[in-house]
Amino acid sequence: MTIFDNYEVWFVIGSQHLYGPETLHQVTQHAEHVVNALNTEAKLPCKLVLKPLGTTPDEITAICRDANYDDRCAGLVVWLHTFSPAKMWINGLTMLNKPLLQFHTQFNAVLPWDSIDMDFMNLNQTAHGGREFGFIGARMRQQHAVVTGHWQDKQAHERIGSWMRQAVSKQDTRHLKVCRFGDNMREVAVTDGDKVAAQIKFGFSVNTWAVGDLVQVVNSISDGDVNALVDEYESSYTMTPATQIHGEKRQNVLEAARIELGMKRFLEQGGFHAFTTTFEDLHGLKQLPGLAVQRLMQQGYGFAGEGDWKTAALLRIMKVMSTGLQGGTSFMEDYTYHFEKGNDLVLGSHMLEVCPSIAAEEKPILDVQHLGIGGKDDPARLIFNTQTGPAIVASLIDLGDRYRLLVNCIDTVKTPYSLPKLPVANALWKAQPDLPTASEAWILAGGAHHTVFSHALNLNDMRQFAEMHDIEITVIDNDTRLPAFKDALRWNEVYYGFRR
């Protein structure tokens, strides 16, 4: 069972009584056939539920009102099978607060050249019925997605499925609670921000709990539960000699397991699905949570270090969006560069907290080594390299008057050396279009040093996310040129200034 099983998307057909009962009966039959086929064959992440025809303003308004109040409804897919006068939709769309996709399709794939008549033309009017619906969306300045293609087309299926992921993610975000253990890393700017504005814009709440509250729960974990979890470690990871039974760091592994169990219990009891820690607020914990955080991220929790609640929330959102897709998604940080002409590289990592969902190795190494930050016992961590291939890094920043999402398309590559003295998980990548352009554009746009790294999601996914939440997006990819990028930042400043 996944999060998508908790939601459904309503399939709404627009028409009108002008065409008579026989035509409306045919429309209903077509709709039932299409919905059944999509649910059976399209591999959509959640179920489509066909609603009664929308043929009057009152019927359409009732559907939109019901969608708002049904927690299982993640959004609406609308098909204008015949012409449906768009003034009938105004009241419903005015109140609709769920994501909306217009499926611009028709029942037949090809025209019946020899038999086509006016009855056929009147029944199959998506071509201009969809344009009428599009006008009212534009007139009302209402953001909605449009997918054009036959309902049996695989590309249309993929696009609808991708939108469904966004819609479910948006619903989940409205219920998301972010727990901050301690505050921000002191004096850091980008990890701070307006939590009230974030809740208004995205729906997630952010609150702080004292580390002592967490320590209380950690200390309540039984030795039996700790030992059972360590047994799981033994079967899941390659244990270094120091972490094995009778190893000199075995106690550190036991303590890491206790912290993991305590953190998970605290998060479950509070209904949290994202959290932050900071090495400056560890009072009462014996080590910085490294292994615990890595494993919790792999279970779907959002996380970011140093109190960075925006990145923690974004990671959770992207984890939901990518559920069931190939590839992983993780907290990440641009750590250091490799400057080599024609082969500039970025080494991404963090002190400890990189999610194993992006690991190249089937069994990462579990080790305990010294950490010079935090002043605590040596922490346990998983060490691995990252899968290769196309990926993205994304950052959500607070500009005061708006939120900006930055996305850099990257290509992860195999680490050419074993890095024997680097005891942390890492990712190595080439930034598009090149490191100088990508880094300068990122800096000019105010991108954070913390990001969400994903093999599972792509630029189109993040564009949809930005559109659905009505936030600015700046893209750095192979098409980026700095003069045009700077111009776009200036134009965005004017555009969003007018919208205040």
Curated annotation (Swiss-Prot):
CDD domains membership: L-arabinose_isomerase
Domain of life: Bacteria
Positions with a binding annotation for Mn(2+): 306, 333, 350, 450
Gene3D superfamilies: 3.40.50.10940
Catalytic activity: beta-L-arabinopyranose = L-ribulose
Family under the similarity heading: Belongs to the arabinose isomerase family.
Role description: Catalyzes the conversion of L-arabinose to L-ribulose.
Protein name from the UniProt record: L-arabinose isomerase
Organism listed in the record: Escherichia fergusonii (strain ATCC 35469 / DSM 13698 / CCUG 18766 / IAM 14443 / JCM 21226 / LMG 7866 / NBRC 102419 / NCTC 12128 / CDC 0568-73)
